[in-house]
Amino acid sequence: HAMIVQEDKEFRKEEIFLMLLGQLLRDNAGETPLPDAYKDESDIGAVCAYLEEHSGEPVSLDQLGEVAGLSKYYLLRSFTKQKGISPYRYLETIRIAKARKLLERNVPMIEVALQTGFADQSHFSRFFKRLIGVTPRQYAEIFGGRQA
């Protein structure tokens, strides 16, 4: 499980590095428009589908670049431009949405953490509270057992 946490951190660090590099290049070399091939929303749609399908697994920018057929730099730039958030942030929203559904079905907290790609319950709880504003336990108490 520690590997998942480590790979998530590496993914986020690489993403931030590439965003900063892109900003430096734009600031010092002028904005270069993306070639038409990079503007195709189906490439980004394929990345979104991949992230949804593999949300409980470690994911890297290299993998996402292969899915889209783009370099990781162009993928990051194009994805962020089209979606308004980075691929990592998009993955986080998928994981939390999945966690919310599982908590509403009264799935045990440790199972929710593992099914949504978190290394342990503690990491999941901190992350969930940061994004949602309540702990997973509080969320489950409020929304758990409701029938749709």
Task: Give each language-model segment a name.
Residues 1-2, 99:
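Conserved small-residue packing positions in alpha-helical repeats and bundles
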Residues 3-68, 81-89, 93:
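Short, Lys/Arg-enriched, Trp-marked, Pro/Gly-tolerant hinge/linker segments that flank
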Residues 18, 96, 133:
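ATP/adenylate-binding site constellation spanning eukaryotic-like Ser/Thr protein kinases
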Residues 49, 53, 58-62, 70, ...:
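Terminal helix-turn-helix DNA-binding modules in bacterial transcription factors
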Residues 87, 135-136:
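Proline-centered helix-kink/hinge sites
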